[in-house]
Amino acid sequence: MTDQSGNGVRSGSASEAPPSAKADFVVVANRLPIDQVNLPDGSTEWKRSPGGLVTALEPLLRRRHGAWIGWPGVPEDADDPDASTEPIEQDGMTLVPVRLSAADVAKYYEGFSNATLWPLYHDVIVKPTYHREWWERYVEVNRRFAEAAARTAAEGATVWVQDYQLQLVPKMLRMLRPDLTIGFFLHIPFPPVELFLQMPWRTEIIEGLLGADLVGFHLPGGAQNFLILARRLLGAVTSRGNVGVRSRFGEVQFGFRKVKVGAFPISIDSAELDQHARTRATRQRAKEIRAELGNPRKVLLGVDRLDYTKGIDVRLRAFSELLEEGRIDPEDTVLVQLATPSRERVQSYIEMREDIERQVGHVNGEFGKVGHPVLHYLHRPIPREDLVAFFVAADVMLVTPLRDGMNLVAKEYVACRHDLGGALVLSEFTGAAAELRQAYLTNPHHLEGVKDAIEAALNQSPEEGRRRMRALRRQVLAHDVDRWARSFLDALASREPINEESH
């Protein structure tokens, strides 16, 4: 489970790895699983950054003598003599820092990755910005990651590249180290063909991904879009037929190479969350949360990173209108919205936060009482223990993104409900909706539909609630994050031909 507090476990066990060490399994991601913390006295500490990806890949890294390549999270001057790129040993893993300057962060990360690719890949909810200077820095930083992977990987090693910030790395790494087996997984949605074609550097992105032996997406639709683009932009020969989930892979014949394309829905460490939710301390904290809220009859909950894709404004409008129409009683129902700060220097995010906080004030001004707000809003990191307790305390979980690659919060809520209580209202435009069919599915672009789904979830019978939650838990507990990682790596290791006609 992602720790929304950012309060990782401090570790003093980091030490430089032997310079000759080579890894048989390498993960390449924008961030390391630990963050560098520069202390006032000039010394450095490392803070662990828990998350779903770390949970999935740490055991694999240890078993396979693996290395993780990524940015430590602190911008540094490239000429800084203290900005070492030497590998670090941390809890049995080799971590290889890639240093980024403040200009790199501004242009490669905040610019091209998050103001160009992020909105484009999320259905252009906010208009993407195209700057050649950002693109050039994206190319440069991707090359830096590829070179680090080439130096780190042993002969014939497996390299797994992660996410939209590093889409050029597979091709660059292939050119540097043709002996490697390379996989790539995209953790956000892959856009429809017509939207992707807006990208000025569309061909370079597709070519970059085709440097991999296996390109993975959350959903078959993303894989199908990629196959169409490879055919249209590069004239590649691609397989016919539909891509399945963890099966029926697509194939691209590109030059002298064949590239597999597949769908692998990511998940969570559901068994660990289930166990955590059962503890006496968690159950007690959940009771305390409800008491702090005034012991309402019903508690609605939203947990999101503060992002325009998450549909926070949609659920606030729906909640407000349900109150106005008398379909929810403000005396016995509260909504808690936990919003983790995100990209606070980006103007569109600043404006979005201001708009959401205006909505919160309006709802409480209209329907709250002194000492009894009907909408509780927290804009700060939330400790992991409190998050689990909030999941246990909530009667209805609201997950209403306009577009989301998967949305692990929905799965986290389900994993915490061993009591078979609660209800999940889930946007149809999340990857999770394809798996969590017993949720109250809704179209976040249709406000009346969102309101109806919330009302139905609030008023479900205990029998209906248990039936739905039992089915949801069966899915989430069976398909955990370890199974996701193993299914991808098994497909990457397999060299079996794909028996489908091509065109």
Curated annotation (Swiss-Prot):
GO cellular component, one term: cytosol
Gene coding for it: otsA
Molecular-function annotations in GO: alpha,alpha-trehalose-phosphate synthase (GDP-forming) activity; alpha,alpha-trehalose-phosphate synthase (UDP-forming) activity; trehalose-phosphatase activity
Keywords: Glycosyltransferase, Transferase
Region described as Disordered: 1-20
Polar residues: compositionally biased ranges: 1-14
The name this protein goes by in its record: Trehalose-6-phosphate synthase
Gene3D superfamilies: Glycogen Phosphorylase B
